Amino acid sequence: MKLEKVLIAGEWRESKNPAGQFHAVNPAEKTELPAGYPVSGEEDVRELLEAGKGAADALRTITPEQKADFLEAYAGKIEALTDELVGTAHLETALAREPRLRNIELPRTTGQLRKAAAAARERSWCRATIDTEINIRSKYGPLGGPVVIFGPNNFPYAYNAVSGGDFAGAVAAGNPVIAKAHPAHPGTTRLLARAAFDAVNETGLPAAAVQMIYHLRPELGFELVSHPFTGASAFTGSRSAGLQLKEAADRAGKPVYLEMSSVNPVFILPGAIEARCAEIAAELFSSCSLAAGQFCTNPGLIFLLKGENTESFVQSVAEQFANGTPGTLLTSAGPDNISATLNILTSAGARIIVGGQKAETQGYSFANTLLRVTGETFLKNPEALQTEAFGTVSLLVIADDPAQMKQIASVLKGNLTGGIYSDLRGQDDDCYQMIEPELRIKVGRLLNDKMPTGVAVVPSMNHGGPYPATGHPGFTAVGFPGSMIRFAALHCYDHVRAHRLPAELLNQNPTGSMWRMIDGEWTRKSIQSAGSSHA
């Protein structure tokens, strides 16, 4: 059968000597969708890298305004395709047309493209730093090679390799992108890539500034992240796949930014339960079951202190899980993966109190599942009992006392988020102060009195955290300009003549509004003259 074309070197063309083919599947009906997609082989990968390197060289002469124009034009083209994008993504993922796809994720996607455009145009993101007395100047700039992006299955727009936050950050920082689609939603990615390519041509970017393939063999993925032409890579997905990519990139000395597994611990203290038992139970289930629990910020590990009110809370949560309708999982592997995780958890001492089996539905599904374990058992098996289940699954850990809860916090692995619910009258303050210092260093984002599922696209956001949530605790995958720094190199100019400097490092502020650090002070002012302090 005729396979869909790939986008390589500024051309939609057939894959050369593909290694195979595949079809997307409608997970709500377990039916194969008609379009066929190629599994790219060595020739495609070689051409991707060569064209990506050429595009990186050409992008050096493209102004920040042109990059911003592209991102804004692309956002507009996505909006013009709303109906087709929503219909296609719904078929491929079973995510709700409304509000999820049309009213939440698509506006988030176009919004972050526009925020990246604003950061590129304003230029403060590059952190221009000038020491006038010795004439040393530095700023962040592009990497000199393409950024390879591997998108996940759970966000067909907002984390898509060709439209998500990694894509927006890489382009805004001045890099071309090689996007590897997720095979769970190739049709959605094809539509997005067509819109991106149209915007490339409309705004005058190099033709290979955006390239896209649908799938490839694992060893070719390793080649992409480790090739000398590659600037950096970004991956969102499972820990096992992420670590294999990291190993390949590390051997070649190439940066790779990973978002992998996270169980997002939430500590719910006694005063909070006493004051808001039913309310918090409902919040927990709502957060855990959102999109069938297929969020990297799903609250999968809940810590409680032993007591009568706690047992009432456990009962309330159990009722929520038992009465909730199981959602549709994204792929055929989903139910089996949850079953495998439950085997690990129960073998380590956890007890299932709700669910625990595949749901009898038309699509891929698993019963909402709640487990419990004592704090003592958790401390005996902390590694196994922190295994992530990608679905509506939470483990309740009942600690004996605050000291044991603190000890539990100290053995947690790195997570994207961690939360603490406490009462509003100060009853839980002592316990909070015991736990918070331990939790703070284990998570990227610390929350109080709210569940972790939502991730706002704002400059102050950190969607990152210590290993194994990510590969480095110092970077965020969400928010501009912070997420752009992953895809930038620090360029220093020592005693370089003015006519050879980039505009951001000249005495004259190139925009009048750009923030620069001049002689140790952040300012928007220009430098009056060479060798003098700024005005």
Protein language model features and the residues they cover:
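Residue-level signal for inorganic ion chemistry
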Residues: 30-31, 67, 89, 174, ...
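Conserved C-terminal structural/oligomerization subdomain of aldehyde/semialdehyde dehydrogenase
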Residues: 32-35, 204, 230, 302-304, ...
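Conserved small-residue-rich beta-alpha loop and adjacent elements
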Residues: 18, 125-203, 392
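ALDH superfamily catalytic-core signature
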Residues: 77, 195-202, 240-380, 407, ...
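Structural signal for hydrophobic packing residues in well-ordered secondary-structure cores
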Residues: 56, 60, 75-82, 86-89, ...
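Hydrophobic/aromatic ligand-binding patch that stacks against planar heteroaromatic rings
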Residues: 168-171, 224, 248, 408, ...
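A structured beta-alpha segment of the ubiquitous adenosine-cofactor-binding alpha/beta core
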Residues: 136-138, 211-234
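N-terminal Rossmann-like NAD(P)+-binding subdomain of aldehyde/semialdehyde dehydrogenases
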Residues: 1-135, 169, 529-534
